[in-house]
Amino acid sequence: MGDLSIQNLVVEYYSGGYALRPINGLNLDVAAGSLVMLLGPSGCGKTTLLSCLGGILRPKSGAIKFDEVDITTLQGAELANYRRNKVGIVFQAFNLVPSLTAVENVMVPLRSAGMSRRASRRRAEELLARVNLAERMNHRPGDLSGGQQQRVAVARAIALDPPLILADEPTAHLDFIQVEEVLRLIRELADGERVVVVATHDSRMLPMADRVVELTPDFAETNRPPETVHLQAGEVLFEQSTMGDLIYVVSEGEFEIVHELADGGEELVKVAGPGDYFGEIGVLFHLPRSATVRARSDATAVGYTVQAFRERLGVGGLRDLIEHRALAND
């Protein structure tokens, strides 16, 4: 089993004609035998990253190396072999076949890999016993609790003993007793040389992680001094899909606010002049920037943290910012 290395990963997709990058320049190194938690709210790129690691989604650029093999370059039979033998995925919705029993669900990847029916059933029974479902193996998913279904999904994911396990929100929709069962099982999976990557927004899972990766940075609200930025015409202040912690107010010149489109073009949203501000929504809600901003002419802008913006410019609560209320005079 090997190490996992993610190098300058960029994932881009299109929504409503606009280009979005939920993952933009991610770098991450994970040693074999590690349990990694991807922490962040919905929409921050956790599931997108798991899809790339699983060979389901191809990134725009960058590399994902597992055991020294760049999986972003795999195609055809090599990619199919990676998906079947190198990675196991535990989906948030379990993805169990309703008409099959627990043991039959676990047998699916084994049979697909060419194992005989007798051997695959024996292996499936061993796995279900390992996750404490020996007495429920002949029950269909509809007769199992949420926690039991999740354990069947885990047993299926490790059926071919893959060195990489990916789990997407494994504690979603489970009660506290079921959560405890799943947490213990996931921790056991990372023992040895296997790499386990878990996407979650559940902070209860963090203590058992070897490493926590915050996909949405937790910017601290501070009263640090405003940052003045001078740009020449054509220079970019920030790019669409990047993260930031400053709200900008134009003091001189003009800035273009543009959406990057799926066809590589741009859509002008607004020209901001002296007294205008922009970039507040992403900062307030810890979202990626929704547009690219560049100087239309030689221009100057001042960047404020949320707290400094409220205090120094007379803006009160979130509603004032979201409704883009006019700024008070200094």
Swiss-Prot record:
Q: Does the keyword ATP-binding apply?
A: yes
Taken from the record, one Pfam family name reads ABC_tran
As annotated, the Isoglutamyl lysine isopeptide (Lys-Gln) (interchain with Q-Cter in protein Pup) covalent link is placed at 65
Q: Which residues bind ATP?
A: 40-47
The ABC transporter domain, residue ranges: 4-242
PROSITE patterns, per this entry?
A: ABC_TRANSPORTER_1 (PS00211), ABC_TRANSPORTER_2 (PS50893), CNMP_BINDING_2 (PS00889), CNMP_BINDING_3 (PS50042)
One GO cellular component term of this record is: plasma membrane
* Quaternary data: The complex is composed of two ATP-binding proteins (Rv0073), two transmembrane proteins (Rv0072) and a solute-binding protein.
Per the record, the similarity remark reads: Belongs to the ABC transporter superfamily.
Protein name (database record): Uncharacterized ABC transporter ATP-binding protein Rv0073
Query: What is the organism field in this record?
Result: Mycobacterium tuberculosis (strain ATCC 25618 / H37Rv)
